[in-house]
C-alpha cells in the first residue's frame, strides 16, 4: 500500500501534464484501483484511530486525479442519460448483489462510483458523491446530499434535505464527519470538515461550518468545528459584544447518553428544550 501511495503522490505532483489522452497506463490503473477500493470500503479517506480522526490525503489526491484521467462518457440512468467522468456505483448491480449487500435504493437516488454504502442502509431519492463512506444501518432521506469524501457513521439518520459538505479542495481540509448513532434534522447543513460526535441530535434547520459558534448553554463554553458527543443542538443566536445586534449560533441545549436516547424518542428530545 505504501508503494501505491507514493505512486499516487508522484502522479498528483505532475497532474498539470495529465489528460485522458496522455496519462500513463500504470497511473490510470493505480487511480482506478484506489477508486475500486474506496467503492468497496477497503480504503476510506478518513478513519478513527485511537479516538482521533486521521485523514489520508493521498486518497483525496487519487480522487482528484480521476477527474484528470477519465473522460466524459454517456451514463445510462434508465429514465434518462447522463454525461460525466464518474460512473454510477450501481450501474452493474443485479438483484443478487443488492440482496447480498443488503441495501435498499429508491428510484432516483444517485451514488457515484468510489463511494461506499454499508449493509442495511436505505437510500431515498438522494445523492452520494465519490469518496464518501456511508456505514451500515444508515438512512439517507429524500433530497439529502452526502458530499465528496464525507464520512457517515453507523445507524445515522440524515433527514430530508440535509446537506453534508464535501471536501476535495483545499486538499488539506478534513472531510465532514457524522459519527455513529447521530440524527441530523431536516434541511440542516453540516459542512467544512465539521465533526458531529457520536450520539448527537441536530434539530431541523441548523447550519454548522467551521466559523459557526456552537454554544453550550449549560457550561457557557463555545466550540468551533466540533459538536461534542451526545449533544442536542438547535439553531439560535448569541448577542454581540456591544449588545446592539445578535449573530447566528448553534446552541447545545442539553446532553444525552445512550440510555436516555433508548428511552426517549428523538422528537421528545428536541421538543423539551427549556
From Swiss-Prot:
Family per similarity comment: Belongs to the transferase hexapeptide repeat family.
One Pfam family linked to the record: Hexapep_2
Name this polypeptide is given: 2,3,4,5-tetrahydropyridine-2,6-dicarboxylate N-succinyltransferase
Gene Ontology CC entries for this record: cytoplasm
E.C. designation(s): 2.3.1.117
Matching HAMAP family: DapD
BP-aspect Gene Ontology terms: diaminopimelate biosynthetic process; lysine biosynthetic process via diaminopimelate
Species for this entry: Shewanella sp. (strain ANA-3)
Amino acid at each position: 500500500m505504501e508503494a501505491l501511495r507514493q505512486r499516487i503522490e508522484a502522479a498528483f505532483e505532475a497532474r498539470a501534464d495529465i489528460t485522458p489522452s496522455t496519462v500513463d497506463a500504470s497511473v490510470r490503473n493505480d487511480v482506478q484501483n484506489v477508486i475500486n477500493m474506496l467503492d468497496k470500503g477497503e480504503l476510506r479517506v478518513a478513519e478513527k484511530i485511537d479516538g482521533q480522526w486521521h485523514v489520508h490525503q493521498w486518497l483525496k489526491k487519487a480522487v482528484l486525479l480521476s477527474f484528470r484521467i477519465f473522460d466524459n462518457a454517456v451514463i445510462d440512468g434508465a429514465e434518462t442519460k447522463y454525461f460525466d467522468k464518474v460512473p454510477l456505483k450501481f450501474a452493474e448491480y443485479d438483484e443478487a448483489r443488492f440482496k447480498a449487500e443488503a441495501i435498499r435504493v429508491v428510484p432516483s437516488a444517485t451514488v457515484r462510483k468510489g463511494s461506499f454504502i454499508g449493509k442495511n442502509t436505505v437510500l431515498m431519492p438522494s445523492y452520494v458523491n465519490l469518496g464518501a463512506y456511508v456505514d451500515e444501518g444508515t438512512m439517507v432521506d429524500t433530497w439529502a446530499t452526502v458530499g465528496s469524501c464525507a464520512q457517515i457513521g453507523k445507524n445515522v439518520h440524515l433527514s430530508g434535505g440535509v446537506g453534508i459538505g464535501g471536501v476535495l479542495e483545499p486538499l488539506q481540509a478534513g472531510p465532514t464527519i457524522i459519527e455513529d448513532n447521530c440524527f441530523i434534522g431536516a434541511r440542516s447543513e453540516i459542512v467544512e470538515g465539521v465533526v458531529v460526535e457520536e450520539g448527537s441530535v441536530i434539530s431541523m434547520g441548523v447550519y454548522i461550518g467551521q466559523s459557526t459558534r456552537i454554544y453550550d448553554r449549560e457550561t457557557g463554553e463555545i466550540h468551533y468545528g466540533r459538536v461534542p458527543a451526545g449533544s442536542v443542538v438547535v439553531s439560535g443566536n448569541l448577542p454581540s459584544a456591544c449588545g446592539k445586534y445578535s449573530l447566528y449560533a448553534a446552541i447545545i441545549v442539553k446532553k444525552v447518553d445512550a440510555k436516555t436516547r433508548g428511552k426517549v424518542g428523538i422528537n421528545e428530545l428536541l421538543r423539551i428544550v427549556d
